[in-house]
UniProtKB/Swiss-Prot annotation:
<dbReference type="InterPro" id="IPR023673">
    <property type="entry name" value="Ribosomal_uL1_CS"/>
</dbReference>
<keyword id="KW-0810">Translation regulation</keyword>
<comment type="similarity">
    <text>Belongs to the universal ribosomal protein uL1 family.</text>
</comment>
<dbReference type="InterPro" id="IPR023674">
    <property type="entry name" value="Ribosomal_uL1-like"/>
</dbReference>
<protein>
    <recommendedName>
        <fullName>Large ribosomal subunit protein uL1</fullName>
    </recommendedName>
</protein>
<keyword id="KW-0694">RNA-binding</keyword>
<dbReference type="GO" id="GO:0019843">
    <property type="term" value="F:rRNA binding"/>
</dbReference>
<dbReference type="GO" id="GO:0006417">
    <property type="term" value="P:regulation of translation"/>
</dbReference>
<dbReference type="GO" id="GO:0022625">
    <property type="term" value="C:cytosolic large ribosomal subunit"/>
</dbReference>
<keyword id="KW-0820">tRNA-binding</keyword>
<keyword id="KW-0689">Ribosomal protein</keyword>
<dbReference type="InterPro" id="IPR002143">
    <property type="entry name" value="Ribosomal_uL1"/>
</dbReference>
<keyword id="KW-0687">Ribonucleoprotein</keyword>
<keyword id="KW-0699">rRNA-binding</keyword>
<dbReference type="GO" id="GO:0006412">
    <property type="term" value="P:translation"/>
</dbReference>
<comment type="subunit">
    <text>Part of the 50S ribosomal subunit.</text>
</comment>
<dbReference type="InterPro" id="IPR005878">
    <property type="entry name" value="Ribosom_uL1_bac-type"/>
</dbReference>
Length: 232
């Protein structure tokens, strides 16, 4: 068994039998198991009682993690004139209009978040088949179609996380790095869970939050107590 295999086996043994534990216990376990040479991402996955194929059961939104994500987020902005200048001044990595559309159509997508002013949507709309599957399509419901370009760019750069339920009703996201303190990770996890809780759709039937798992990039997952994670 190689080093990585032994490391994973040891990490798995450490979490064996530990289910429905508190956020604090889970974070301590994951940090203790993180022995890789790179800074692992701590990821959360939540199984929700929704069928996102129905419009009244779609779950999506954003949350500003209090301690950021630890990741460098590359932001693209579709804008012209003063708004393009505002985006650049706010720290956007790529700013453009038709030229940016052509770049994306050509298959070059060197950004993690996409923002657009409302007047740019006829252009951005042509990129739906490219941006949509990557969850990069600007949307007014999550604040990425806006005239307040400065605020949107700063939020994206400052640790704002977007979430959206997938077909199986699962929401997942990175909530920090293994190098974060336990307190920082706990705070981020609780902020994310709270945001998903508040995004409960009108069509959700039965138990909304069914399972919550926390894992690191190279480690096994641990099951959280839903009651503890939600503060109920």
């Amino acid at each position: 068994m190689g080093k990585m295999g032994k490391r994973f086996a040891a990490a798995k043994a450490a979490v064996e039998g530990k289910e429905n534990i508190t956020v604090e216990e889970a974070v301590a376990l994951l940090k203790g198991n993180s022995k890789t040479k790179f800074d692992e991402t701590i990821e959360i996955a939540m199984k929700l009682g929704v069928d996102p194929r129905h419009a009244d059961q779609m779950v999506r939104g954003t949350v500003n993690l209090p301690n950021g994500t630890g990741k460098t987020v590359r932001v693209a902005v579709f804008a012209r004139g003063p708004k393009a200048e505002e985006a650049t001044a706010a720290g956007a990595d790529i700013v453009g209009a038709e030229d940016l559309m052509e770049t994306v159509q050509g298959g070059t997508i060197e950004f993690d978040r996409c923002i657009a002013t409302p007047d740019m949507m006829p252009i951005v709309g042509r990129l739906g088949k490219v941006l949509g599957p990557r969850n990069l399509m600007p949307n007014p419901k999550i604040g990425t179609v806006t005239m307040d370009v400065k605020e949107a760019v700063e939020a994206a750069k400052g640790g704002q996380v977007q979430f959206k339920a997938e077909k199986a009703g699962v929401v997942h996201a990175g909530v920090g790095k293994a190098s974060f303190t336990e307190a920082q990770l706990v705070e981020n996890v609780r902020a994310f869970v709270d945001a998903v809780s508040k995004a409960k759709p009108s069509g959700s039937k039965g138990t909304y939050m069914q399972k919550i798992n926390l894992t690191s990039t190279m480690g096994p997952g641990v099951s959280l107590s839903v009651e503890n994670a939600t503060g109920n």
